[in-house]
Amino acid sequence: MATVSMRDMLKAGVHFGHQTRYWNPKMKPFIFGARNKVHIINLEKTVPMFNEALAELNKISARKGKILFVGTKRAASEAVKEAANSCDQFFVNHRWLGGMLTNWKTVRQSIKRLKDLETQSQDGTFDKLTKKEALMRTRELDKLENSLGGIKDMGGLPDALFVIDADHEHIAIKEANNLGIPVFAIVDTNSDPDGVDFVIPGNDDAIRAVSLYLGAVAATVREGRSQDLASQAEESFVEAE
């Protein structure tokens, strides 16, 4: 199963927290000290906590669980999309719309509208419209794709959230908490770990660190899914006998 070593984390700068004046005292147990007024995260805590989170995500994906990757700030946006796509999972990488989980019924209607517009753009319907109407629909399609494209095939609520930057994505975490969906999150020294089921203390800004987390999670999810496919194949083989 995918694991991450301390050497990997040091190379990626996972240990660099935020400036000491921005700290959240709830993160004190995970802080090693400070250097040049920047908090240093204790990787002896982070390594086992991240690997424990990976093991749990592996189990969830082996049960066909759906994992929603959330990272809407610029540093994470593209990497979040790539990681989710690489393991056939789902993502929100632009703005988190309030109610995305807690008001799923309404979100589902918007997803239906998105899919209808996609069909219209491909089957020639747009060509039959006036230029103005076609432009309006194209804009609506782009807007919906931007906010819902990563979850349009999710088909229901996710079984877990993997979040880059607990502070930035606090609304998503709160919604998941309200619905009892487990939250796995990268929590920097300026963030509140409350509401996060699997806290991963680490830098949430450095692109190398963000890529390290996402790469490891995507790999562990792919492994979990292949275990699930292997057990399905085994079952059908037994039935055939």
UniProtKB/Swiss-Prot annotation:
Key word Phosphoprotein present in the record?
Answer: no
- Identify the CDD domains for this entry: RPS2
Q: Where is the signal peptide?
A: none
Per the record, its GO cellular-component terms are:
cytosolic small ribosomal subunit
Which UniProt key words apply to this protein? Ribonucleoprotein, Ribosomal protein
Question: At the top level of its lineage, which domain of life is listed?
Answer: Bacteria
Give the record's GO biological process terms: translation
Q: Does the keyword Transport apply?
A: no
- List GO molecular-function terms, semicolon-separated: structural constituent of ribosome
InterPro entries from the UniProt entry: Ribosomal_uS2, Ribosomal_uS2_bac/mit/plastid, Ribosomal_uS2_CS, Ribosomal_uS2_flav_dom_sf
Q: Would you identify the family this protein belongs to, as annotated?
A: Belongs to the universal ribosomal protein uS2 family.
Question: Sorted alphabetically, which NCBIfam families does this protein's record hold?
Answer: rpsB_bact (TIGR01011)
The name of this protein is Small ribosomal subunit protein uS2
Lineage summary: Bacteria, Pseudomonadati, Pseudomonadota, Gammaproteobacteria, Enterobacterales
Annotated gene: rpsB
